[in-house]
């Protein structure tokens, strides 16, 4: 990877495009980069130490917390607090938003929402996992503690978002609203290097990603769409390929590169869907729109939804533009059949 730009160099270059930029966002992204390296090191050695498995506690959603969930949450929180650009964080692993109390943090203008380790239950079987993050400007007065209102903002107000995927190689993918860029971690120099510049998702794809084990519980429109994907229509490129890893970051990353759609609809047991709007769906929606795709709850643009609670859930359809539009058509056509 010699000759490639590192993430740090790239951020500085982009900052130079804005003469009045303070550098706070650049420093914040450096904090995320540092925490990602620390978590990556621990994940790579997960099978050698006592860091896999559950800790015996549940998060606010009632999900068993894995040891690495707690570890990643602690490391990202510590890194974000240390640089003084963040006044508070909200996390899947925290019941409530955390306001940083140091005076320097209270003078910061950003809040961060995150899923510190998406897909962590897959660690034990060596499946790719990831970190998802979303950054907003606070709405509360600078110089005061962060409030819940700082976090309950619609996705279109994000100033940056991204994810880290810990897989066969580790990548950090992010956007600040000017395209999507991916950086692969080079352990020989300890840096993320630009490997995927101006990432764009194809308008059409041949991959659909959904947990078909829940088929019987899906809305009728989703069932019909799955059957549509499976039909043998060679001139239309069907049947499509079914690929579902069970880690949002991993499924999203593959579809971003190759074209496809990820679906997590409402079900009988989860009528509001299962994925969280603020720190899973919104950041992925920002990324996919910047890459030329679409993110929807089946009716509405994800980033237009006004959140009412920190851990709010929504149905989620994200990926190639034409594929998301098609599933929306099926949902509308069969809406009265529920």
Swiss-Prot record:
Its cofactor is Mg(2+). CDD domains: FBPase. The keyword Disulfide bond does not apply. Mg(2+) 1 binds at residues 92, 115, 117. One of its GO terms (molecular function) is magnesium ion binding. Pathway: Carbohydrate biosynthesis; gluconeogenesis. Mg(2+) 2 binds at residues 115, 118, 280. GO terms for biological process: fructose 1,6-bisphosphate metabolic process; fructose 6-phosphate metabolic process; fructose metabolic process; gluconeogenesis; sucrose biosynthetic process. It is found in: Cytoplasm. Binds 2 magnesium ions per subunit. PROSITE patterns: FBPASE. Pfam families: FBPase, FBPase_C. Keywords: Carbohydrate metabolism, Cytoplasm, Hydrolase, Magnesium, Metal-binding. Disulfide bonds: none annotated. Its EC number is 3.1.3.11. Substrate binds at residues 118-121, 211, 244, 262-264, 274. It catalyses: beta-D-fructose 1,6-bisphosphate + H2O = beta-D-fructose 6-phosphate + phosphate. GO terms for cellular component: cytosol. NCBIfam families: PRK09293.1-1, PRK09293.1-3. Belongs to the FBPase class 1 family. Homotetramer. This is Fructose-1,6-bisphosphatase class 1. The gene is fbp.
